[in-house]
Amino acid sequence: MSAPTILIMAGGTGGHIMPGLAVAEVLRERGWRVLWLGNPDKMEGRLVPPRGIELVPLRFQGVRGRGAAALLKLPFLLARACAQAWRRLADIRPDVVLGMGGYVAFPGGVMAALRRMPLVVHEQNAVAGTANRWLARLARRVLSGFPGVLPRGEALGNPVRADLCALPEPAERYAGRSGALRVLVVGGSLGAHALNTTVPQALALLPEQARPQVVHQAGEQHLPALQQAYAQAGVQADCRAFIDDMAGAMAQADLLICRAGAMTVSEVAAAGVAALFVPFPHAIDDHQTANARFLSDAQAAWLQPQATLTPQWLAQWLGQRTRQELQAVAGRARTHALPRAAAHIADVCEQAARRAS
């Protein structure tokens, strides 16, 4: 008997691709054949093939925010992508199709539904993306990382790395710590200019004996400017382009200052670390603010809009934090973790395939 086949559709950003890869790994361990529908010219073209997963090419990208000329081309681009997806699905004949978001998932999902192939959709963010809002109407099962995102949605969580889920409980990690608070600042692989400029200036406003120990990840492109910003502020910090062991860095931190992508928020909960979220203000539909509120509304994190993140505000806010308070917030964050999300999404895919057979 041949192995069952799943076609995963995801692309454009790591927030769609990485959770898809986590589900792919679970299904491969269960004996499934995994194929990936994506644009070889985009991020999935760099991330998926090195994992030993065949990338089935489909070139399609969104036109939102690209102007009137791009919008006029949309019907032609979409028709071409749908024709490509129809042929790819005919060749592959997958037992189930999983859409994890990104524009490339839309034509593939529509064609899968027209071919009456079981379609499962997973939305990572607290505000559904354009493709998933439409595909949810066609899907057999609708899954999400956060509650209340889509009609018929089942909140199974976002797949996160096992090393984060395996960290000891916050009470155990924070116990016995003394001295300056340990702050981890993460701007993502490309850095975050607002954090890179505001944090050094804020720390300079604090008395030297009240300053936390800082590890600040800025992205390779922004590292020299970040180091200069700390030097000009007269503040010592461990500035890094990348952090290879993010689980270890989170385990050592009393506080994380970061953006609020869906995966970041889910990782904060999985690790059980206190976080100050500064959502990226230009995210589509302001979805990062909605992501952050999943924890901040439960007093399991803090949320500060970038527009009001000033050095003066941040200095005052940091000066008011205690390790005991941070431990309590970290503990509340951990209660919102869904560490088996990847396995549960894989379960749903298997169920959908069985019901269609």
From Swiss-Prot:
Residues binding UDP-N-acetyl-alpha-D-glucosamine, per UniProt: T13, G14, G15, N125, R161, S189, I243, Q288
Organism name: Bordetella parapertussis (strain 12822 / ATCC BAA-587 / NCTC 13253)
Enzyme Commission numbers on file: 2.4.1.227
Record-stated family: Belongs to the glycosyltransferase 28 family. MurG subfamily.
Catalytic activity: di-trans,octa-cis-undecaprenyl diphospho-N-acetyl-alpha-D-muramoyl-L-alanyl-D-glutamyl-meso-2,6-diaminopimeloyl-D-alanyl-D-alanine + UDP-N-acetyl-alpha-D-glucosamine = di-trans,octa-cis-undecaprenyl diphospho-[N-acetyl-alpha-D-glucosaminyl-(1->4)]-N-acetyl-alpha-D-muramoyl-L-alanyl-D-glutamyl-meso-2,6-diaminopimeloyl-D-alanyl-D-alanine + UDP + H(+)
Entry keyword set: Cell cycle, Cell division, Cell inner membrane, Cell membrane, Cell shape, Cell wall biogenesis/degradation, Glycosyltransferase, Membrane, Peptidoglycan synthesis, Transferase
HAMAP family the UniProt entry points to: MurG (MF_00033)
GO cellular component term of the entry, any: plasma membrane
Pathway: Cell wall biogenesis; peptidoglycan biosynthesis
Role played: Cell wall formation. Catalyzes the transfer of a GlcNAc subunit on undecaprenyl-pyrophosphoryl-MurNAc-pentapeptide (lipid intermediate I) to form undecaprenyl-pyrophosphoryl-MurNAc-(pentapeptide)GlcNAc (lipid intermediate II).
Catalytic EC class: transferase
PANTHER family named among the record's database cross-references: GLYCOSYLTRANSFERASE, UDP-N-ACETYLGLUCOSAMINE--N-ACETYLMURAMYL-(PENTAPEPTIDE) PYROPHOSPHORYL-UNDECAPRENOL N-ACETYLGLUCOSAMINE TRANSFERASE 1
Membrane topology: Peripheral membrane protein
Gene Ontology biological-process annotations: carbohydrate metabolic process; cell division; cell wall organization; lipid glycosylation; peptidoglycan biosynthetic process; regulation of cell shape
GO molecular function: UDP-N-acetyl-D-glucosamine:N-acetylmuramoyl-L-alanyl-D-glutamyl-meso-2,6-diaminopimelyl-D-alanyl-D-alanine-diphosphoundecaprenol 4-beta-N-acetylglucosaminlytransferase activity; undecaprenyldiphospho-muramoylpentapeptide beta-N-acetylglucosaminyltransferase activity
Name listed for the protein in its UniProt record: UDP-N-acetylglucosamine--N-acetylmuramyl-(pentapeptide) pyrophosphoryl-undecaprenol N-acetylglucosamine transferase
Subcellular compartments: Cell inner membrane
